[in-house]
Amino acid sequence: TELGKTVGAAPAMIRLDASHGFAVATFLRQATESGLPIDLRYRNSTDAVAALSRGESDLAGFHVPTGEFEAPSAERFGKWLDARSHRLIHLAYRTQGLFVNPGNPLGIHSLSDLSRADVRFVNRQVGSGTRMLLELMLSQFEINPATINGFENTEFTHSAVAAFIASGMADVGFGVQTAAERFKLDFIPLARERYFFAVNAESLDQPGMRQVIDVVRSNSFRDAVHQLAGYDATDTGEILTLSQAFNAAPRKQAA
C-alpha cells in the first residue's frame, strides 16, 4: 500500500508560492495548526502564478485590484492562467495605499506628491503585484516614475517598506494598510484588491486541497482576517472560475 494512502498517514505537503501578504501568513499559521503541512515560498505574483502553470506548486497566491485597474492587471496573468484548468480561491479583500510618518509631517496626500523634491520614496521590487499596481496608477495620472526620488530603492515585503520609513530612511511607500499600522505609520488608502489562491481545478477534490479549503472557510480564519487592518473577509472561501472572478477572463497568451 502506498504510504500516502495508508490510514492515518500524514497529509501530503502543499506547495504554496505566494505574493507577500498578511492573510497568507495567517493561513500558513492556521493550516500548520490544523496539521496540514505547507511549503511556503514568498515570491512576486507573476512568479507565483508561473510556477503553478509549470507544475512547480499546488497553490499560487496573487492579487488583483478591483475597479478600473482590474482588467489590465488580470491580463498580465493571462500567460499562465487557463480558464478551463484553473480555479481561484478568494482569500481576502485588502486595501493598498501610501505609508507616511505619524501626523504626515510632509503633507503627502496623493500620488502627485511623490514627485516633490523634498519627498523620499521606497518602492517594492520589480515584478511584484504591488509595484505593478502602483505603476498602473502613476500612468493613469501621467506621473513619470523618473521624477520620483527613490523609485528604484526597493524592498521585498510590505513590512520591509514600512520599516524603512519608520527608521527614517524614506518618507513614503506604497503597500497594504496592515503593515503601516504595525509600524505605527499613517495610511492613505488608494486602492482595493482581491487576493486569490490559484489552483488546478482537478486538484480541488484531493484531500490536501479539501483541507486547504476547510481552513480558508473556517470561522477562525475569517475572524483572523477581519482583525487585520485594511482586510475584509466578506467573500473569503469562494471558489471561482476566471470568468466569474473577472469581467473578462484573462486570455491565455501564446508562449
Q: Can you name each region flagged by the protein language model?
A:
Residues 46-60, 65, 154-169:
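Short helices/loops that flank or line small-molecule/ion binding pockets
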Residues 102-109, 143, 202-207:
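Short helix-loop capping/hinge motifs at secondary-structure junctions, enriched
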Residues 63-77, 162-191:
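A ligand-binding cleft/hinge motif common to bilobed small-molecule-binding domains
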Residues 91, 100-121:
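Flexible hinge/capping segments at coil-to-helix
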Residues 10-20, 112-131:
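Short loop->beta-strand "edge-of-pocket" segments that line small-molecule binding or catalytic clefts
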Residues 26-34, 111-112, 124, 130-151:
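Ligand-binding cleft/hinge of the Venus flytrap
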